[in-house]
Amino acid sequence: MGKSGGKRPGSQKRTKTDELPIHRDLPLVIEGLPAGTRIEGYRDFVVQDLKIAAHNTRYRRTVYRLPDGSLQVADLPAEVSGHFGVQLKQFILYQVHQTHVSHARLLEQLHEYGIDISAGQLNAILLYGHDAFHAEKEALLPTAREVSGVLHTDDTSARHRGQNAVCTHFGNELFASFHTTDSKSRLNFLRLLCLPEERYSLNEEMLLSLELWGAPQVLQERIAALEEAAYLGRETFAKQLDRWGITSESHRTMVCEAALYGTLLTERWYDNLGLVSDDAPQFKLLGFVHGLCWVHAERKVSRLIPLTPQHQQAVENLRDQIWKFYQRLQAYRVAPRETQRVRLADEFDRLFQQRTGYPALNEALKLLFAKRDGLLAVLEHPHLPLHNNLSESDIREYARLRKVSGGTRSDLGRRCRDTFLSLKKTCRKLGVSFWQFLKDRLSGAATIPPLPDLMRQAAAAH
């Protein structure tokens, strides 16, 4: 029997098009039917399509001559800003930040659609008038400090003004925030942790940090003689260092790090937050709960190149033992018990203190055992993830964008890239359409709540 053209008899399954909004109904008729024929109804066939074309609106602003002889012109609608409309700006931002279309190809695309726009005008749309977007992005990390228990972090290389730079990522299941800066260092990481304000504090915590980091005694005494104070901004604090006669670059860096650390410890922003990262030195901070990524750690073993079958077998055996131990740690996270905690700690010691007949593998075991506190942080803090895959996945988006457009050439361009990438990834995690988000913010409709508010709601729901 032939197909009837509809669903199978008795099927209750709804078609995929049942809930689509219909923009146009087009009745189809048959000509030349015999007399007495009557219409019984319709069988709908829905076709999805897309309209892409220039759409120009001419606002004819009425000019009035008032009785006193003066002229008054009707105002433009509130959403009109310049000679390019909301949907065009939305499309441009989406193409660049979501689909990673290069500026040159986007300009060509717009010209083929019939849009009269220059390279300079396209650049202006991408760079200017985004203060509200920047403010929303800058609120993501402080909000995460309030509502989260875990913060993933990682970094990747970047290019800015033709020079090497670094992009640092913070994120978890609620948000992602990207920050491109000039250097990869502990000082840079501390500055980012203090966002949105870079505040330098002279207090007991700062002095303790200088002592623990082995600052010269003369430097410690000079700082200890100063009154407690707080300085807002990098330039302000740099001027204070000049007034105090601290000219050595290494001493200035050490004091800046300690002053930022003093702010973090005083504000207690990260007391209930665990950091998860690879073992990069800039992420190592005293007083922080810091879990290390097992995937990164295991690479010290997986990247070995054994030259004999015996060495190859030793590597395979150890990798098998590591991942079986990893699975037991995952089970502990779900249902932690004291007896299991002690047993896992002992098992870790036996696993990474063993010796094989492969010297390079023995060296890898020593290095992994030295990371014991970070790799076993989950035993004291079961909420910590055992890997940093979330951060690596997020930051891969930045790497793809870097391949398309290379580096940034202006500070504003760098800021826009960080902002829109952060907002896009955060929208995705919160279940918000980035396309609709752009339209909502550009039009001023504000029907989508601020992303920090959605983060708080999502955290409360969990």
Each PLM stretch: what is its role?
Residues 33, 66, 92, 106, ...:
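Mobile genetic element proteins and their domesticated derivatives, centered on retroelements
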Residues 51-149, 332, 424:
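Short, positively charged, Gly/Tyr-enriched micro-motifs
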Residues 90-94, 152, 160-229, 237-240:
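Acidic, metal-ligating active-site segments
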Residues 146-160, 277-278:
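Two-metal-ion RNase H-like nuclease active-site motif
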Residues 230-251, 267, 273, 277-285, ...:
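Acidic/histidine-rich catalytic cores and adjacent linkers
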Residues 274-275, 279-282, 286-318:
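Conserved beta-strand -> loop -> alpha-helix junction used to position metal-binding or nucleic-acid-contacting
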